[in-house]
């Protein structure tokens, strides 16, 4: 299994269990998230409550919770939305911090295509949700989420060059 860690914070943000598509010449990865139900385990122990005088489901009060699989798996923390000015300030700082960690062809590809990726994100800014890794590190990568038109499940966007592949 491969896990993708944030190069700046070390937080685990994604794994190969979630297939991705490259956007903007590979600068962004697009990953489909899914709403899943967590909790509310229905255990059939083979007893017949009506024969035993039991009432309607006197078992444990088990609460079902709907969560997004990627958010839950990697313990992503939702952040307040950015306005355009805040987003541009974040992107400038992020690019500066990330380029210090990149070398060679990876650095060249990032520098060449990050502007178009930034414009792509800016075009969706009003529809984006913002998530950071579990450590909530100020300079870490932000994971962006949005809902495609008519979609019930969110789509996540990652800066590919900000992820480090780690084998587990």
UniProtKB/Swiss-Prot annotation:
One GO CC term on file: cytoplasm
UniProt cross-references to Gene3D superfamilies, sorted A to Z: Metal Binding Protein, Guanine Nucleotide Exchange Factor, Chain A (2.170.150.10)
Compartments (UniProt record): Cytoplasm
Database matches in InterPro entries: Mss4-like_sf (IPR011057), Mss4/transl-control_tumour (IPR011323), TCTP (IPR034737), Translation_control_tumour_CS (IPR018103), Translational_control_tumour_p (IPR018105)
Domain named TCTP: residues: 1-168
UniProt KW keywords: Calcium, Cytoplasm
Pfam families, per database record: TCTP (PF00838)
Main localization, broad class: cytoplasm
Keyword Transmembrane helix: no
Similarity field: Belongs to the TCTP family.
Role played: Involved in calcium binding and microtubule stabilization.
The protein's name in its UniProt record: Translationally-controlled tumor protein homolog
């Amino acid at each position: 299994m491969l896990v993708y860690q944030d190069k700046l914070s070390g937080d685990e943000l994604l794994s190969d269990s979630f297939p991705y598509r490259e956007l903007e010449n590979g600068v962004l990865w697009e990953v489909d998230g899914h709403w899943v139900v967590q909790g509310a385990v229905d255990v059939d122990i083979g007893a017949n409550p009506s024969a035993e005088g039991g009432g309607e489901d006197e078992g444990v009060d088990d609460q079902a919770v709907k969560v997004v699989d990627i958010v839950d798996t990697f313990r992503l923390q939702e952040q307040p939305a950015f306005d355009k000015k805040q987003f541009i300030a974040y992107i400038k700082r992020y690019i500066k911090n990330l380029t210090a960690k990149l070398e060679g062809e990876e650095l060249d590809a990032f520098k060449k295509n990050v502007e178009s990726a930034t414009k792509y994100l800016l075009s969706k800014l009003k529809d984006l949700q913002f998530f950071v890794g579990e450590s909530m590190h100020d300079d870490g990568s932000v994971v962006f989420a949005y809902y495609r038109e008519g979609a019930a499940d969110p789509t996540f966007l990652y800066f590919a060059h900000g992820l480090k592949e780690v084998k587990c």
